[in-house]
């Protein structure tokens, strides 16, 4: 039995909480009037695991009345299992193939906020799609801040190592040039409250013109 067949078997036997929600992302609503953008370009969030892509993405979606999609959750909905299970059955190469296929589809949608996985920028075709199809925001955080945010998260297969802090540092060295390569805007997340970050992002997005 090949890896894909194994994954299908795992999917059928081990449904995961939240899959239904992930499979049907809906536009977020809020009490404040929707912020205005002079374009319908999708907004793509890139950055390391723990940078705040999902949390900030949801905040932006609420402010802009846009649909929010988390690429990892989209993959989990399609496969029926969590990301660590995909890694376990198909390895990182198999996961990256699935990730690339989902990213190519999602980046063609208009008026969405898409939170990508930390390693989505590794593939050249992914970077090209991100650069050409929307506004890319690199959410930047220090290794220490990333470690603090991810140290208790068991849903991070790449950090299942003897020294997760050192692993984060190595991943940052390899990936940061790629984040900067695709980024239209770079935002330091630090310890700033999410609402403040989102509020500071809105005028930058309103003023931005895609080159």
From Swiss-Prot:
Cofactor(s) needed by this chain: Mg(2+)
Gene: aroK
Protein name, UniProt field: Shikimate kinase
Sequence positions that bind ATP: 50-55, 156
Keyword Chaperone recorded: no
Organism: Bordetella pertussis (strain Tohama I / ATCC BAA-589 / NCTC 13251)
GO biological process, one term: aromatic amino acid family biosynthetic process
Record EC number: 2.7.1.71
Subunit (UniProt): Monomer.
């Amino acid at each position: 039995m090949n890896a894909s067949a194994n994954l299908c078997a795992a999917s059928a036997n081990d449904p995961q909480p939240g899959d239904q929600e992930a499979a049907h992302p809906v536009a977020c609503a809020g009490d404040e009037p929707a912020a205005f953008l002079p374009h319908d370009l999708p907004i793509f969030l890139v950055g390391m695991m723990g940078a705040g892509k999902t949390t900030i993405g949801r905040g932006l979606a609420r402010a802009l009345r846009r649909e929010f999609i988390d690429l990892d959750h989209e993959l989990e909905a399609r496969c029926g299992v969590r990301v660590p299970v995909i890694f376990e059955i198909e390895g990182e190469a198999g996961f990256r193939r699935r990730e690339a296929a989902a990213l190519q589809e999602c980046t063609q949608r208009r008026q969405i906020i898409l939170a990508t996985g930390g390693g989505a920028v590794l593939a050249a075709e992914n970077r090209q799609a991100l650069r050409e199809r929307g506004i890319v925001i690199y959410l930047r955080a220090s290794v220490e801040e990333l470690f603090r945010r991810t140290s208790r998260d068991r849903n991070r297969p790449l950090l299942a190592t003897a020294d997760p802090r050192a692993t984060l540092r190595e991943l940052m060295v390899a990936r940061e040039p790629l984040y900067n390569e695709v980024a239209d805007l770079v935002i330091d997340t630090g310890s700033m409250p999410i609402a403040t970050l989102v509020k500071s992002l809105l005028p930058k997005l309103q003023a931005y013109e895609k080159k």
